[in-house]
Design a protein with these regions (language model features):
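Bacterial N-terminal signal peptides that target proteins for export
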Residues: 1-9
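Bacterial N-terminal signal peptides
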Residues: 8-18
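Boundary at the C-terminal end of the N-terminal hydrophobic targeting segment
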Residues: 19-26
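Well-structured core secondary-structure elements of compact alpha/beta domains
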Residues: 26-71, 85-102, 133-140
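Cell-wall glycan
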Residues: 34, 41, 106-116
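Charged, alpha-helical scaffolding/interaction elements associated with membrane systems
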Residues: 72-73, 116
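Surface-exposed patches in mature extracellular/periplasmic domains of secreted proteins
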Residues: 75-82, 120-123
């Protein structure tokens, strides 16, 4: 149930089309690129339309500090558990795995070039500031 919630929230943030990830998984492509997948952890620092500019700046600075901590070797999962406001925070930010073609094209271009353990830049989304970590590529 939690995985479903996480995927629905991610769909609103990151997916190229309104179809759910399950749709992509139940209609596999014969193209070899369809076998590519990336597994992700997330840290979300929420913002809302009602936040003041100072609150948004504070959230951005917090996200940037968390990214720096992760880049310096702190456990991304522990940082997510302690700081993320996303639905997968209790699971260390574990969002699961996503096949190529499910995420927004720009995000895929970034994530499918990252190596396991790499941490993304801070991204500003409708939900707030997001940091992603690739945990695995093409898992079997």
């Amino acid at each position: 149930m939690l995985k479903q919630s996480v995927r629905l929230i991610l769909a609103s943030l990151l997916f190229a089309s309104p179809c759910l990830p399950q749709t992509a998984q139940t209609h596999p492509s014969t193209d070899d690129s369809a076998r590519d997948q990336v597994c992700l952890n997330e840290i979300l620092i929420r913002t809302s339309k009602s936040d003041t500019p100072a609150q948004v700046t504070e959230a951005q600075h917090k996200a940037e500090g968390l990214r720096k901590a992760a880049k310096k070797g702190r456990s991304f999962a522990n940082l997510a558990k302690a700081n993320s406001q996303g639905p997968a925070a209790a699971q260390g930010g574990d969002l699961g795995c996503f096949k190529r073609g499910v995420l927004a094209k720009k995000l895929e271009e970034l994530l499918f070039h990252m190596q396991p353990g790499e941490v993304s830049d801070v991204m500003n989304t409708k939900q707030g500031f997001v940091i992603l970590q690739v945990t695995d590529r093409n898992p079997r």
